[in-house]
Amino acid sequence: LAVQDLKKQPLQDVAKRVEEIWQEFLAPGAPSAINLDSHSYEITSQNVKDGGRYTFEDAQEHIYKL
């Protein structure tokens, strides 16, 4: 849901929300950590640097296919 909501955020809020999602779900020691394969994790960690609305697309697709 966090990723879906990110896509609807005003552009000025997107980068901040990307960082919040990263820290909550994907960063080392994240409190609500999700498990991604190494390929999806690498792509997503690179995308976080750009901070766009579609930063988590690969991760979302990977989780959906589980």
Swiss-Prot record:
Membrane topology classification: Peripheral membrane protein
Localisation per UniProt entry: Cytoplasm; Cytoplasm, Cytosol; Membrane; Nucleus
Nucleus recorded as keyword: yes
Molecular-function annotations in GO: GTPase activator activity; protein domain specific binding
InterPro entries: RGS (IPR016137), RGS6/7/9/11 (IPR047016), RGS_sf (IPR036305), RGS_subdomain_2 (IPR044926)
Domain RGS: 1-66
Assigned keywords, A-Z: Cell membrane, Cytoplasm, Membrane, Nucleus, Signal transduction inhibitor
Functional summary from the UniProt entry: Regulates G protein-coupled receptor signaling cascades. Inhibits signal transduction by increasing the GTPase activity of G protein alpha subunits, thereby driving them into their inactive GDP-bound form. The RGS6/GNB5 dimer enhances GNAO1 GTPase activity.
Notes concerning its domains: The RGS domain interacts avidly with Galpha and mediates the acceleration of Galpha-mediated GTP hydrolysis.
Protein's name according to its UniProt entry: Regulator of G-protein signaling 6
Organism: Rattus norvegicus
